[in-house]
Amino acid sequence: MDRIVEIEKFSPDETYETSLRPSNFDGYIGQENIKKNLEIFIKAAKKRNECLDHILFSGPAGLGKTTLANIISYEMNANIKTTAAPMIEKSGDLAAILTNLSEGDILFIDEIHRLSPAIEEVLYPAMEDFRLDIIIGSGPAAQTIKIDLPKFTLIGATTRAGMLSNPLRDRFGMQFRLEFYKNEELAIILEKAALKLNKTCEKNAALEIAKRSRSTPRIALRLLKRVRDFADVNDEEIISEKRAKEALDSLGVNELGFDAMDLRYLELLTEAKRKPIGLSSIAAALSEDENTIEDVIEPYLLANGYIERTAKGRIASLKSFDVLKLKYNKGLFDEK
């Protein structure tokens, strides 16, 4: 079943929520330190008439990595070409992309941690020396043909920075980790987005949606669209706190941003009474794949202290027992 709070993964040519995304830094809310540094680096690069150094964005899904890449393209007056690592299956696929770049272009690769080692090998000289090394033939007769590439900026995005190989990670001159948003920041984003949807969103309504959005802009914007539907059906031009609560309750998203899947996950861990449960066991119990659990369900729960991740598996924290209103033996949480 589809989850309204799920961070969906999209192919690069899909334009999910494009109309609601900011196109420049002036309209970009949150991630202030990253934004400040990027503005300086962009001004410096433009002053020297150079390409930006390669950039790596990491962090949970839905926080604005793709949006930042497009803003950088806009601010640099550069063309951006977008792809995702799973689409680059052979070294020839990457070679075709690189040889079609023009001077100053930006290449954005989403899910860059999923590049195969063979593809990474092709990328190294391209990033470092703007050169493509193509091997023709095999064995003693093999020859390497070197093709010069135009200078470009590679922007990589990943939800799993730890899965990047060290040689690839080290070739990014700028590395930024995006953090979860504060409710107040999300409320501002929602109020601005509502205007683009020809609605006015009351501040309290925006805060109500924000606190149920798992600190994630993409989820907040998705919830806003559904709340707008409830307002439209009731012929309301203003989204009120009452209407927002009604819509979100109807969607099954509680005050903490949890839906039925999150609650099932927490129930599974609390039933184990602080005994670690492995990822594969959790996936089997929830009928979900392991990647979805690690990339979609767990980041918010981990960041907010609802669960603990150990070498032996996942453990419910005290907050999980409180959320589910469960009685527990305080001895479960004694330091061992």
From Swiss-Prot:
Residue ranges of the region described as Small ATPAse domain (RuvB-S): 182-252
Binding site for ATP: L20, R21, G62, K65, T66, T67, E128, D129, F130, R171, Y181, R218
GO biological process per UniProt: DNA recombination; DNA repair
Residue ranges, annotated region (Large ATPase domain (RuvB-L)): 1-181
Subcellular location: Cytoplasm
Enzyme class name: hydrolase
Keywords: ATP-binding, Cytoplasm, DNA damage, DNA recombination, DNA repair, DNA-binding, Hydrolase, Nucleotide-binding
GO molecular function, one term: four-way junction DNA binding
Catalytic activity: ATP + H2O = ADP + phosphate + H(+)
Annotated EC: 3.6.4.-
Amino acids binding Mg(2+): T66
A Gene Ontology term for the protein's cellular component: cytoplasm
Annotated positions binding DNA: R309, R314
Subunit structure: Homohexamer. Forms an RuvA(8)-RuvB(12)-Holliday junction (HJ) complex. HJ DNA is sandwiched between 2 RuvA tetramers; dsDNA enters through RuvA and exits via RuvB. An RuvB hexamer assembles on each DNA strand where it exits the tetramer. Each RuvB hexamer is contacted by two RuvA subunits (via domain III) on 2 adjacent RuvB subunits; this complex drives branch migration. In the full resolvosome a probable DNA-RuvA(4)-RuvB(12)-RuvC(2) complex forms which resolves the HJ.
Record comment regarding domains: Has 3 domains, the large (RuvB-L) and small ATPase (RuvB-S) domains and the C-terminal head (RuvB-H) domain. The head domain binds DNA, while the ATPase domains jointly bind ATP, ADP or are empty depending on the state of the subunit in the translocation cycle. During a single DNA translocation step the structure of each domain remains the same, but their relative positions change.
Name this protein carries in UniProt: Holliday junction branch migration complex subunit RuvB
Organism per entry: Campylobacter lari (strain RM2100 / D67 / ATCC BAA-1060)
Lineage: Bacteria, Pseudomonadati, Campylobacterota, Epsilonproteobacteria, Campylobacterales
Gene for this chain: ruvB
